[in-house]
Amino acid sequence: MHEMKLNPTVFKCPMKILTILIAMLLVSCGTRNPAPVAELLDRIGGEGTSGRIETQIESDLAEEGKEVFEIGSRKGKPFIQGSSMSALTAGIGWYLNHYVHVNLSWNNLTTDLSGVHLPVPAVKERRTCSADYRYYLNYCTYSYSMAFWTRERWEKEIDWMALHGINLPLALVGTDVVWKNMLEEIGYSRAEIDRFIAGPGFQAWWLMYNLEGWGGPNPDWWYKRQEELCSFILRRMRELGMEPVLPGYCGLLPSDAADKLGVKATDQGYWCSGFTRPSFLVPTDEKFDDLAEIYYRQQEKVMGKSRYYSMDPFHEGGSTGGIDLKGAYNAIYSQMRRHSPDSRWVIQSWQENPRKEALEAVPQGGYLVLDLFSDGSPKWMDGYDGHDFLWCMLHNFGGRVGMHGRLDATMKGYSEALRKYPGNMKGIGATPEGIETNPILYDALFELPWMTEDECADWIGRYSEARYGTESDVMKQAWELLASSVLACPTSQQGVSEPVVCARPSLDVRSVSAWSTCGIYHDVAKVRKAAADMLEEKDRLAGHPNYRYDLTDVVRQALTDSSYFLLNDVADSWKRGDKENFRKGYE
């Protein structure tokens, strides 16, 4: 026999071809069972969950640039694919809700799936997302709800975001560290820094340029803690396909900056008649570029870079006198782009913002406008001069407990905006001042972009089954009653109708806290009936955590509604001198 010898020169070309073919095969197969997703599954469902579900990122699934997920089967297991990481995790959330009938929300962020049947779909389901962006959070959320959260709580929240397909969350943790480092670099003493940086419960309004120093000073251990927490939060967000929105630099400086630094910084007066606002460094000042460079450099050390930066000069007031507004907005935008060339300015549409000069100063594609209160006081009707915008639900003003919302208006409003401005209505957002209440609204909002309009009509029935793990006409009816009453606020009322029992004792209670009302806008009989309906299912559902939470919430709402009318009755009896009825009322 003759020994066969391979000619390296001849074999060289086929080897290259083989290598290319293997590479193409790997690309076509996508990324199977990505580690961040496997870890997510084990966190939310218990160890071993990732071994029971096949997952894959397959970019070729995308449909005309829109994200897609598919739910099918492979190797006898559920198989969930997404065109992106966030599409994949949204698909997992959809599978849990609508196949496994397990609904994870703030009252129940994890579960044990070890003994739960995971259905293997016989037919593949495909969903295309109409929203390029799914935004989440409000500056206020960081103070009303998140000020003292631990790493463990943040981990669960980011998992919740992933399951809801959120790909653009506001990220503020660590910004106080950035400012401390920046101010030290430009010559501020620790005492001066302490007078400027607000405490954790008030940093939302500090970062929106409404106040300075309130609730501080912060100890050294706090800054160390926040820097470590910031690193974890941003790393986990990015692992799960989210692009954090970081706070950019638009001229914020301590109120003494004009004297301290010798810059042209305008006095911004007071916010809410009592809080000293930070000064505004006029962006045409010769030192603006240098200070912006220092800010972004210090921020990159702590938070990294982003393609999205949030800035809202003159938020809820401030003085624009003597400022070339178009020049100022253009300078702010230019510095952001110098630091991150492909970045976009995320700006809140709230009260006077964004001003006409702002829309004129920045080119198309430069802004991403958050129509902050679309569900109650929309401003998107004129289309923001062609700038891209997001339809947002602003919920839970003041971080108060109670049932309130606009479920039907949310479902219809998003579709209406998409029809009117298909070119620049780019997505959806939840911009709550506080969270951890009314989970139905957030489940509806973030499923909206993955549904057709026709599917909205019977969504409550599907939600009820997902929420409690079983079909129940009684629970479905209860939610329909709530959706047509307390979750159907007909006005722009900012938040819940506060319970009179929480107010200072008086026969004429109109509000409990600032910017609120105790007035009731809904049919309280429907809420009472919903509570009674839910109680009917106690024997069957008492062991379910979502049922226990919802029953408590709805009964509480029914009782606080009753207290409003009871107080009015007592007050009327007092005014009439009807002692007997008065005594019955307060007893």
Question: Which sequence ranges carry the predicted segments?
Answer:
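Acidic/histidine-rich, surface-exposed loop or edge segments in extracytoplasmic proteins
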Residues: 73-75, 138-142, 567
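Sec-dependent N-terminal signal peptides
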Residues: 17-27
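N-terminal secretory signal peptides that target proteins for export/translocation
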Residues: 1-13
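Contiguous, structured surface segment used for ligand recognition
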Residues: 29-131
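N-terminal structural segment of carbohydrate-active enzymes
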Residues: 90, 131-174
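Catalytic-core regions of glycoside hydrolase
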Residues: 103, 107-118, 137-141, 162, ...
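Second-shell loop/turn segments in exported
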Residues: 77-82, 142-147, 220
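Histidine-centered catalytic/metal-binding microenvironments
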Residues: 514-587
